[in-house]
């Protein structure tokens, strides 16, 4: 008996270490704000968006002009005043894209930047969802541990009653042993719930950009809401505006524009050059300076090996992205419907357990104790009622946890915190 009590004290101390009552309480919205600002994955995605934006301007820029400085037709003796065609020359050459390949390349890079931006939004909502799940897991694991402690107190009361009746010769040893066994089993549950809370807190701390040991806050009750009855509004918004779909649409545009740009490069750009030659006097006679101008263009002799092959590659990538878009649309639709149905079922389960089952079972426990004190029933009936109440309280906490998980996953699908009573933090799009 003493070993059971000492193990209970150790478990209670561990629970108090996991949920420090003196710490500042952390609510879910504060946790999400910290995820938005300090999560390292989001910092990486913001840098990728910035890199994609920086690639837009170079994609459509003209090539830099080439300047030439030199000497033409110089005799081997190195003199500039012997031959009329000897001259010092300065020239400039510029490639001029006249058929729009650069413009198409710039638009393709812009579409790639849009895809990265939508990917950043999607990463934010996914991490918000993961943080909500971790927060709910940590909170409800703590609630389960507290429920175990409360049930342990009831078991201690049962053990005392059973032992007192047994010592007086009016009880059975079986009742004492069953109560002590249940008391020990509660310690096993308590250890499991405490481990679950620690793991969930570690996940939440990592998502918030903290070290695991740094999350010493107590947790406020997470928001509880009932999902809408009709999933049509959710599904309509998902199909229209979900960042995953916007990213894939932008990828389709990117590859289609890149294919057009590759084909447009077959159309010859102009290479324009101008040069000016300075001549020295010959035998005291001044020589006129000379200038030259040329226009050249590319002959697409090997276009099949380069530009057209690149265009075909981009066409294939565009088709692949279109297929990915269709698959993502179907996947999001089924996820939205499935999660909505699960959340509705969880919501009904929570209402039923909280409003009817648990309250009725508590009255049953009180009635069984009254009947036991009046001598109308034995202690085993009290034990059964108390154990049933503990099981229903655990089921209620698990149902609330499942509801929070499904709503968190719906948040990643809908990107709408207002459906769940949350004001989502503004998405940070750059580090500056």
Report each predicted region and the residues it spans.
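Periplasmic alpha-helical coiled-coil/stalk elements that build and connect Gram-negative outer-membrane
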Residues: 3, 10, 26, 124-241, ...
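Sec-dependent N-terminal signal peptides
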Residues: 8-16
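N-terminal signal peptide c-region/cleavage motif recognized by signal peptidases
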Residues: 18-20
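Bacterial Sec-pathway N-terminal export signals of envelope proteins
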Residues: 22-71, 86, 95-98, 104, ...
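Short flexible linkers and secondary-structure junctions
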Residues: 24-137, 144-149, 155-159, 170-173, ...
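Small/polar-residue-enriched beta-strand and adjacent coil segments characteristic
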Residues: 27, 65-123, 244-258, 263-328, ...
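Amphipathic alpha-helical coiled-coil segments
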Residues: 44-56, 123, 127-148, 157-159, ...
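Short, charged, amphipathic alpha-helical segments
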Residues: 106-110, 173-181, 312, 379-387
């Amino acid at each position: 008996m003493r070993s059971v009590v000492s193990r209970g004290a150790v478990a209670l101390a561990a629970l108090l270490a996991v949920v420090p009552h003196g710490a500042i309480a952390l609510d879910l919205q504060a946790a999400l704000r910290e995820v938005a600002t300090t999560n390292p994955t989001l910092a990486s995605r913001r840098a990728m968006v910035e890199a994609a934006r920086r690639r837009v301007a170079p994609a459509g820029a003209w090539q830099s002009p080439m300047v030439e400085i030199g000497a033409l037709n110089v005799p081997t003796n190195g003199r500039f005043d012997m031959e009329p065609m000897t001259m010092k020359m300065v020239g400039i050459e510029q490639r001029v894209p006249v058929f729009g390949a650069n413009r198409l390349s710039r638009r393709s890079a812009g579409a790639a930047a849009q895809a990265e931006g939508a990917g950043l939004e999607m990463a934010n909502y996914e991490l918000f969802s993961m943080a909500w799940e971790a927060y709910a897991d940590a909170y409800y694991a703590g609630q389960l541990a507290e429920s175990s402690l409360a049930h342990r107190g009831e078991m201690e009361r049962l053990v005392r009653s059973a032992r007192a009746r047994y010592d007086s010769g009016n009880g059975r040893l079986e009742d004492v042993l069953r109560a002590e066994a249940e008391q020990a089993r509660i310690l096993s549950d308590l250890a499991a719930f405490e481990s679950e809370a620690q793991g969930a807190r570690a996940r939440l701390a990592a998502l918030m950009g903290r070290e695991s040991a740094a999350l010493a806050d107590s947790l406020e009750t997470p928001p509880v809401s009932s999902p809408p009855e009709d999933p049509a509004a959710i599904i309509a918004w998902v199909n229209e505006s979900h960042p995953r779909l916007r990213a894939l649409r932008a990828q389709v545009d990117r590859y289609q524009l890149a294919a057009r740009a590759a084909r447009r490069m077959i159309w010859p750009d102009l290479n324009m050059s101008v040069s000016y030659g300075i001549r020295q006097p010959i035998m005291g006679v001044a020589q006129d300076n000379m200038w030259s101008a040329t226009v050249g263009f590319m002959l697409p002799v090997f276009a099949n090996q380069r530009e057209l092959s690149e265009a075909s590659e981009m066409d294939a990538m565009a088709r692949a992205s279109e297929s990915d878009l269709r698959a993502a649309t179907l996947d999001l639709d089924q996820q939205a419907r499935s999660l909505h149905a699960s959340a509705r079922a969880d919501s009904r389960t929570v209402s039923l357990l909280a409003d009817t089952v648990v309250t009725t079972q508590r009255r049953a426990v009180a009635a069984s104790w009254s009947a036991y004190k009046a001598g109308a029933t034995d202690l085993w009936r009290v034990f059964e009622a108390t154990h049933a109440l503990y099981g229903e309280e655990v089921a209620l906490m698990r149902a609330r946890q499942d509801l929070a998980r499904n709503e968190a996953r719906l948040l990643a699908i809908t990107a709408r915190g207002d459906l769940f009573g949350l004001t989502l933090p503004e998405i940070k799009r750059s580090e500056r």
